[in-house]
Curated annotation (Swiss-Prot):
Biased composition, class Polar residues, residue ranges: 39-48, 104-115, 256-275, 356-380, 393-409, 416-445
Composition bias, Basic and acidic residues: 180-198, 286-299, 321-334
Keyword terms: Repeat, Secreted, Signal, Silk protein
Region annotated Disordered, chain positions: 39-119, 131-494, 518-1157
Protein name, per record: Sericin 1
Length: 1186
């Protein structure tokens, strides 16, 4: 090791050669030796040299330090080599060095170790002249660490490097490798830690063809994580994949992307979670011609499954979706297709729901038993649509069946007992088909089957009185209507085919006569005062009107009223309703308004009677028109009063349809209202009334909106005997597909009230369901609101009440700048007095889905309120309110939706008075929003029932405000509903007042609309003294500087029904007025706009056995651009002797419509409608050749 010592020895050897000279015969050989010894150390060295080689060595030892050094050097023809060793036994140190070289290369190595610290290091180097290899290693036993490194340089220019480090103390190991030549590069890195059970590695490869690949993975056993990423690239394509899993949460996710040389690509994601039982996957594939995407989701926890697919190619775009929910056994699927040029489109929607339900109650204290079972409640519905350049076809249908059984038994210690058994079986089916081309056809089918059986028994030992009743009814109905129309125009024909029946004639400026196919009107009534049966009151009214190619506007109004009265003898009365159809095809800047009103009144006194009356249906169609609007309003009012004997009343509801396809800048508004009132006194009666259904459809429209509103109100009051009341709910559907800058708003409201006094009764009422769908909509919004209110009041006897809830669904897929808002509200109230009662009420469920939405928001609110109060003394007051606020952040072009619901119920009996008041206020604000919407809904329901003493006062109101400023392509929708019911019996008077006010404001909006709807319903039933009922509804809608917009204000429907018997007199008045007709003429900066106002009022009062009744009803409507029709029907009947009265009134406003049409600026064609050919003015008849 001591190079200085070696050099010294070599120098001494050279000097000795010169000093001593050459020995004879051995002149090229030199040998030198040196030795030195003492007690502490010893040294020795030598040098040998001959002609070709030299060798030298040295050795040194120290006994005190316990160390020694050795070195050896050799040089000759084979090369040069050197080795050295050093040892220190005292400190346990060792070191070595070796070196060798020859003509072909060489090698070297060195190392040291320390046994005291257990450390060791080594270095190696080898070369063969072309290739070089080097390595090093280190070891530390104290820290359990080890380190290795290696490098290679090859003759071809390639090289590689690797390193390895490990430490048992930190339980960590790291490895790195790198290799490169002129074509290939590879690198990898690996890191593992045993203490945290974690391992990660990464790699990179580049091949000779230029392709690259890289990846990394991370695994952790402690946190149960595993992540992997892989990417690759070639000269033609790229791709990648990422996987992640967490076994602690039982989660897995996967994403991939691949592209092909032809430019196509596919990508997808997969997610699954076993902990919350969810799975989701999405795939997308695209090439130069088409793109396909699919989305699948499932939740085994919520028992839900959904899938959606979209495909877009050169021919067009198709969309399909499927939903399945196993918890309530519900299925739905939809398909839609739109051609690339927009000429061919179709859509299919199917839904199915099955539910089973049973309930059993038992109480030992009062021996109360009640059980009910509803099984196999199945409903199916479908919707089909098709359109091309020439044809617009639409068909829809629904099918439902229901079986229901209920029974109750009650007894107390005083001997009073009552039992009730009811069985129901329902079946219904409906179908609707619309087809439009050069001709048009519309057909509607419906079938209904209703079977009911009820048995009631009451016994009381205290009064030794017993009463039993049994009733069974079976009802079947089927209806079918079909209409078709075609129009033929001839330029030079001078002969006109004329049918002198009840036909309408149209006159235009080109002196052409077009025939409008119409129906006949038939009415008949018969009454008898003899001791025989009164039957045969059959009233019907049908009218159809069709228009073709109108340039400006058209209006149709039809009204039918039928009355039948039979007195003093048992009788039956049947009356059918009225149907009105209006169709408009290819109208520019036109307006279609269709209004149908039906009023039926039946009064039978002092004997048993049964009555069945059909509802009212209204259709309005519009296709391919620009800048126009379609408004259709249907109203049905049915009233049945039977006194002093058993009677049953069944009345059908009201259905309204509005269709619009391929229109720009327009609006579709349809409103259906149904009101049914049944009053039976002093004997057993049953009342069944159907609900109200409203449909609104819109496809491929820009800048427009679809609004549909359905309202159903049913009231049954029976006194002094057993009665049962069943009422159906309200369903509303709104569909919108591929709409831009549009909105879909649908509102359904159902209110049912049943009041039974002094005997056992049962009430069952269905809920309300609302659906709103929107797919592929941009800058649109979907808003759906369902409200259901059910009230049952039983006094002095046993009763059971069961009411269904409310369900609301809103779906939105692939929407940009859109929003989904769904609101469900359910309120159920049961008040039974003097005896134990049971109340069962369903809740409220709300669903909102949004997928792949940008800058959107989803808001869903559900509210359910149930109250049961049974009292024997004093009074109770209950009041509650609900306020709800919804916020959305980080959304641009979004929406704010807030919903409030308040329900208050008070029931007091036998003493004192009670006062209940409740209100609901809801506010939604949106400022500076683009393509957004503000939707706010308030609902208030108040119910008061007081019996036998004093007076009660109930007042409730609902106020709703919605503001939107500086919104483009937006909409403001606000809806207020107020329902108040008061039932007081046997003493004094009661006063009930309720109102609803709704405000909607919109300023500086383009393609927007303002919609405000108010509905108020008040019902009062008193047996003695006087009762006063007043109801009002006020609605205001404002719009300024709107283009292609529409303002619709509907002062909905106001219904007041009163029934009083046994004494005194009753006076009722109801008035509804709307004054906004001339606003049309005062508007500025409005293009293709429309405002429609419709008021309907129906008032009916029945008084029997004594005194007189007076009824007053007024309706005033002033509206402008198109004909606005108001229909008022008033029927009053009082029977104290053998007398019968029948009244029928039909009013149409012809001349007012004619005047407005004549004075409207820019009118291209004038349309006049006449019932009889002789009503045509002489100069007109002369011009058309009549």
């Amino acid at each position: 090791m001591r190079f200085v010592l070696c050099c010294t020895l070599i120098a001494l050897a050279a000097l000795s050669v010169k000093a001593f000279g050459h020995h004879p015969g051995n002149r090229d050989t030199v040998e030198v030796k040196n030795r030195k010894y003492n007690a502490a150390s010893s040294e020795s060295s030598y040098l040998n040299k001959d002609n070709d080689s030299i060798s030298a060595g040295a050795h040194r030892a120290k006994s005190v330090e316990q160390s020694q050094d050795k070195s050896k050097y050799t040089s000759g023809p084979e090369g040069v080599s050197y080795s050295g060793r050093s040892q220190n036994y005292k400190d346990s140190k060792q070191a070595y060095a070796d070196y060798h070289s020859d003509p072909n290369g060489g090698s070297a190595s060195a190392g040291q170790s320390r046994d005291s610290s257990l450390r060791e290091r080594n270095v190696h180097y080898v070369s063969d002249g072309e290739a070089v290899a080097a390595s090093s290693d280190a070891r530390d036993e104290n820290r359990s660490a080890q380190q290795n490194a290696q490098a290679n340089w090859n003759a071809d220019g390639s090289y590689g490097v690797s390193a390895d480090r490990s430490g048992s103390a930190s339980s960590r190991r790291r490895q790195a490798n790198y290799y490169s030549d002129k074509d290939i590069t590879a690198a990898s890195k690996d890191d593992s830690r045993a203490d945290s059970s974690r391992r990660s590695n990464a790699y990179y490869n580049r091949d000779s063809d230029g392709s690259e690949s890289a990846g990394l993975s991370d695994r952790s056993a402690s946190s149960s994580k595993n992540d992997n990423v892989f990417v690759y690239r070639t000269k033609d394509s790229i791709g990648g994949q990422a996987k992640s899993s967490r076994s602690s949460h039982s989660q897995e996710s996967d994403a991939y992307y691949n592209s092909s040389p032809d430019g196509s690509y596919n990508a997808g994601t997969r997610d699954s979670s076993i902990s919350n039982k969810k799975k989701a996957s999405s795939t997308i594939y695209a090439d130069k011609d088409q793109i396909r995407a699919a989305n699948d989701r499932s939740s085994s926890k919520q028992l839900k499954q959904s899938s959606a697919q979209i495909s877009s190619g050169p021919e067009g775009t198709s969309v399909s979706s499927k939903d399945r929910q196993y918890s309530n056994d519900k299925r739905s699927k939809s398909d839609a297709y739109v051609g690339r040029d927009g000429t061919v489109a179709y859509s299919n929607k199917d839904s199915e729901k099955t539910s089973r339900q049973s309930n059993t109650n038992y109480a030992d204290q009062n021996s109360v038993r009640s059980d009910s079972a509803a099984s196999d409640q199945t409903s199916k519905s479908y919707d089909r649509g098709y359109s091309d350049k020439n044809i617009v076809a639409h068909s829809s249908g629904s099918r439902g069946s229901q079986n229901q059984k209920s029974s109750s038994y009650r007894a107390d210690k005083d001997g009073f007992s009552s039992s009730t058994n009811t069985e129901k079986s329902k079946f219904s089916s409906s179908n609707s088909v619309v087809e439009t081309s050069d001709g048009a056809s519309a057909s509607r089918e419906s079938s209904a089957e209703d079977t009911k059986s009820s048995n009631s028994n009451v016994q009381s030992d205290e009064k030794s009185a017993s009463q039993s009743s049994s009733s069974r009814s079976s009802q079947e109905s089927a209806s079918y209507s079909s209409s078709s129309s075609s129009s033929t125009l001839s330029e030079d024909s001078s002969e006109v085919d004329i049918d002198l029946g009840n036909l309408g004639w149209w006159w235009n400026s080109d002196n052409k006569v077009q025939r409008a196919a119409g129906g006949a009107t038939k009415s008949g009534a018969s009454s008898s005062t003899q001791a025989t049966t009164v039957s045969g009151a059959d009233d019907s009214a049908d009218s159809y009107t069709w228009w073709w190619n109108p340039r400006r506007s058209s209006s149709s109004s039809s009204s039918a009223s039928s009355s039948s009265s039979g007195s003093n003898v048992g009788g039956s009365s049947q009356s059918s309703g009225s149907s009105t159809s209006g169709s408009n095809a290819r109208g520019h800047l036109g307006t279609v308004s269709s209004t149908g009103s039906t009023s039926n009144t039946d009064s039978s006194s002092k004997s048993a009677g049964s009555r069945t009356s059909g509802g009212s249906s209204t259709y309005g169609y519009s296709s391919s028109h620009r800048g126009g609007s379609v408004s259709s309003t249907g109203s049905s009012s049915n009233t049945d009063s039977s006194t002093k004997n058993a009677g049953s009343s069944t009345s059908g509801g009201s259905s309204t349809y509005g269709y619009s396809s391929s229109h720009r800048g327009g609006s579709v508004s349809s409103t259906g209202s149904s009101s049914n009132t049944d009053s039976s006194t002093k004997s057993a009666g049953s009342s069944t009334s159907g609900g109200s259904s409203t449909y609104g459809y819109s496809s491929r429209h820009r800048g427009g909106r679809v609004s549909s509103t359905g309202s159903s109100s049913t009231t049954d009051a029976s006194s002094n005997s057993v009665g049962s009341s069943t009422s159906g709910g309200s369903s509303t559907y709104g569909y919108s597909s591929n709409s831009r800058d549009g909105s879909v708003s649908s509102t359904g409201s159902s209110s049912n009230t049943d009041s039974n006094s002094n005997s056992a009764g049962s009430s069952t009422s269905g809920g309300s369901s609302t659906y709103g769908y929107s797919s592929n909509s941009r800058d649109g919004s979907v808003s759906s609101t369902g409200s259901s209110s059910n009230t049952d009041s039983n006094s002095n006897s046993a009763g059971s009440s069961t009411s269904g809830g409310s369900s609301t669904y809103g779906y939105s897929s692939n929407s940009r700048d859109g929003s989904v808002s769904s609101t469900g509200s359910s309120s159920n109230t049961d008040a039974s007095t003097d005896l134990t009662g049971s109340s069962t009420s369903g809740g409220s469920s709300t669903y909102g889905y949004s997928s792949d939405s940008r800058d959107g928001s989803v808001s869903s609110t559900g509210s359910s309120s149930n109250t049961d109060a049974s009292t024997d003394l004093a009074g109770s007051s209950t009041s509650g309110g609900s306020s709800t606020y919804g916020y959305s952040s980080d959304c641009g072009d979004g929406s704010v939706s807030s919903t409030g619901s308040s329900s208050n119920t008070d029931a007091s009996t036998d003493l004192a008075g009670s006062s209940t008041s409740g209100g609901s206020s809801t506010y939604g604000y949106s400022s500076d929003s683009r393509d957004g919407s503000v939707s706010s809904t308030g609902s208030s329901s108040n119910t008061d029932a007081s019996t036998d003493l004093a007076g009660s006062s109930t007042s409730g109101g609902s106020s709703t405000y919605g503001y939107s400023s500086n919104s483009r392509d937006g909409s403001v929708s606000s809806t207020g509903s107020s329902s108040n019911t008061d039932a007081s019996t046997d003493l004094t008077g009661s006063s009930t007042s309720g109102g609803s006010s709704t405000y909607g404001y919109s300023s500086s909006n383009r393609d927007g609309s303002v919609l405000a709807t108010g509905s108020s319903s008040n019902t009062d039933a008193s047996t003695t003294e006087e009762s006063t009922t007043s109801a009002g509804s006020s609605t205001e809608g404002y719009s300024s500087s709107s283009h292609d917009g529409s303002v619709t204000s509907t002062d909905g429907s106001s219904t007041s029904g009163g029934a009083s018997s046994s004494s005194a007199s009753t006076a009722k008045s109801d008035a509804a007025s709307s004054e906004d007709g001339f606003w049309w003429w005062n508007r500025r900066k409005s293009g293709s706009g429309h405002k429609s106002a419709t008021v309907q009022s129906s008032t009916t009062d029945k008084t029997s056995t004594d005194s007189a009744s007076s009824t007053d009803s007024t309706s005033s409507t002033s509206g402008a651009s198109t004909t606005t029709s108001g229909s008022s029907s008033t029927s009053g009947g009082s029977s104290t002797s053998d007398a019968s009265s029948t009244s029928s009134s039909v009013s149409r406003s012809h001349h007012s419509g004619v005047n407005r049409l004549l004075h409207k600026p820019g009118q291209g064609k004038i349309c006049l409608c006449f019932e009889n050919i002789f009503d045509i003015p002489y100069h007109l008849r002369k011009n058309i050749g009549v």
